[in-house]
Amino acid sequence: MKLCGFEVGLDQPLFLIAGPCVIESMQLQLDTAGKLKEVTDKLGVNFIFKSSFDKANRTSGTAFRGPGMEEGLKVLAEVRKQIGVPVLTDVHEYTPMDEVASVVDVLQTPAFLVRQTDFIRKVCSAGKPVNIKKGQFLAPWDMKPVVEKAKATGNEQIMVCERGASFGYNNLVSDMRSLAVMRDTGCPVVFDATHSVQLPGGQGTSSGGQREHVPVLARAAVAVGISGLFAETHPDPSKALSDGPNAWPLDQMEALLETLMELDAVTKKHGFSRFA
């Protein structure tokens, strides 16, 4: 599949979707995107910047949700213009898709909305590539009908994303078998290495996280074989306005990516048919 001008798939190098969870300010987004571009250019990694203009599913009703669509799209447009990278953002049921699609390169559907048929069709009809996040409550094989709904719109640029499965209260686990199972959708598979270490609602009024396990799960996913890696990052996760506990520090992205790209090359060297 072609995405933002480059090919993605199990016969292609790992690509990266990364950025702060939520748009906090113009300068933070530009600085973060600039640093990520510097790192990915150095390592030869295809890169898409991500950040959200509205986090509609915060644990607390008083938590920071973002600047809103109008201001958020201005920021994403500036990142795209000044840094020269494609941009991704997530959308919601109330989002005017055409307006967002006129600014960003890739649309993303929140995991909690994966079963909303009309929503999936609406997003996939906007004429942009779509990254569909698998719900924490959904079996990997249940992504097949979701993809069928998506592709029924005529959009063939669909990716599926694993972000962990609910395991009791306030906890997620990553079943690495799901990455292989979701290949049966015929779509590129992306692994979300940071939301997978989230502890949803684990701090009472906010979610916790175990960012120390990001490299563990990222390495495991790359070893299984994935097309892309999704990772939220922040210059200072302790001060992030959303999902700080599971965000990977920006100054550690290069070291993590360097390891993952080496592992990706080894994993994909001989293909995957022998494991089918």
Swiss-Prot record:
SUPFAM superfamilies: Aldolase (SSF51569). It comes from Stenotrophomonas maltophilia (strain K279a). It catalyses: D-arabinose 5-phosphate + phosphoenolpyruvate + H2O = 3-deoxy-alpha-D-manno-2-octulosonate-8-phosphate + phosphate. InterPro entries: Aldolase_TIM (IPR013785), DAHP1/KDSA (IPR006218), KDO8P_synthase (IPR006269). This is 2-dehydro-3-deoxyphosphooctonate aldolase. GO terms for molecular function: 3-deoxy-8-phosphooctulonate synthase activity. The keyword Transferase applies. It is an enzyme of class 2 (transferase). Keywords: Cytoplasm, Lipopolysaccharide biosynthesis, Transferase. Its EC number is 2.5.1.55. One of its GO terms (cellular component) is cytoplasm. Pfam families: DAHP_synth_1. GO terms for biological process: keto-3-deoxy-D-manno-octulosonic acid biosynthetic process. The gene is kdsA. Belongs to the KdsA family.
